[in-house]
Amino acid sequence: MEIKNHFGVYGICLQDGKLLCIEKTRGPYQHRFDLPGGSQEIGEGLTETLKREVLEETGYTLISYCNPRIYDVLVHEEEQDFAVHHIMAFYDIVLDFEGSQKSLPHEVLDGSNDSANAIWISLEQLTEENASPLVLKVKAELRGFPELDKSSYMNWKVKHAKSTSS
């Protein structure tokens, strides 16, 4: 099986026991909660990527960032002949909620924006059924049990519709 590498930079913003997430609109994590962040542009530094992606996906400006760390996951989507080794740099972030929130762009330089809304979700509500592997890594870390080894999702189900709660 072919393995493709993907590297991204992501922000972790926790307030009152809730994690700031975005709702993915496309890709393997579509219709799931994910972290604000994404891929670097050519020549862009890690924190430049962090600032740009967080603004694009949440509408909020970054005030500060700290505590950089690296995690990774291997994701093999059902019915695909390849897997993605997703390597992620995480930063704890503080956002400017006092300033005005920018409207989210419909398009960004690399195509359509792949996120819809920024939303606060309690850690208890985040599960393998509704969250990306990135969010699950953060949840484990915040619970005091960081998963330092690579996590593997060998039959990852891409959700083709947003699930509704009963």
Regions found by a protein language model. Name each.
Residues 18-56, 161:
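Conserved Nudix-box catalytic region and its N-terminal flanking loop in Nudix hydrolases
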Residues 108-166:
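Nudix hydrolase/Nudix homology domain
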Residues 30, 62-65:
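Short secondary-structure junction motifs
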Residues 40-63, 73-131:
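Unchanged
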Residues 1-19, 65, 88-92:
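Conserved N-terminal beta-strand and adjoining loop/helix that marks the start
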